[in-house]
Amino acid sequence: MTHLRSRSGNVTHVMQGQLYISQTPGESLTCILGSCVAACVHDPALRIGGMNHFLLPGRDPHDTGSVRYGARSMEALIDALLHKGADRQRLNVWLFGGANVLGTQTGIGAANSAFAVDFTRAQGLTLRGSDLGGTRGRRVHFTPATGDPRVDYMQSDGIDDPIAGPLGAPGVELF
């Protein structure tokens, strides 16, 4: 995680495969998402919240406990909040990301989105809102103490942008 100070308070950038919780007034969490998903979870009575940022749906097939996978990431975030005194019945969840930013057919963004929604419902948590899917990346801002999320879309979806032009020159063979 990267912690920054600004005039408006502390900003913590939650990177892929990380999670962070806080109840510090003025602290803000942020992440940049493509096909990854972030859950922002908040207990309004305790004024505590957190954010995760997972890359892959489900469980780690090698059972390493990595929070890069949705199941472990979601469980770890909720457990950390409960450990600090949050009440599962009061937890509000917002889900973001899961885009198809590269225009490929892998479906990882859709799989991440479906996993996050299914997990939230299966755990009996309140899904307050979501902004999932599409073709554009997002920057998510979340204030854990107040539970206020905000999303900014990336400027270009990048799908129609060429990655590189043709390689080689007449008479040159590339291998």
Swiss-Prot record:
<dbReference type="InterPro" id="IPR005659">
    <property type="entry name" value="Chemorcpt_Glu_NH3ase_CheD"/>
</dbReference>
<protein>
    <recommendedName>
        <fullName>Probable chemoreceptor glutamine deamidase CheD</fullName>
        <ecNumber>3.5.1.44</ecNumber>
    </recommendedName>
</protein>
<dbReference type="GO" id="GO:0050568">
    <property type="term" value="F:protein-glutamine glutaminase activity"/>
</dbReference>
<comment type="function">
    <text>Probably deamidates glutamine residues to glutamate on methyl-accepting chemotaxis receptors (MCPs), playing an important role in chemotaxis.</text>
</comment>
<dbReference type="Pfam" id="PF03975">
    <property type="entry name" value="CheD"/>
</dbReference>
<comment type="similarity">
    <text>Belongs to the CheD family.</text>
</comment>
<dbReference type="InterPro" id="IPR011324">
    <property type="entry name" value="Cytotoxic_necrot_fac-like_cat"/>
</dbReference>
<dbReference type="InterPro" id="IPR038592">
    <property type="entry name" value="CheD-like_sf"/>
</dbReference>
<dbReference type="GO" id="GO:0006935">
    <property type="term" value="P:chemotaxis"/>
</dbReference>
<keyword id="KW-0378">Hydrolase</keyword>
<keyword id="KW-0145">Chemotaxis</keyword>
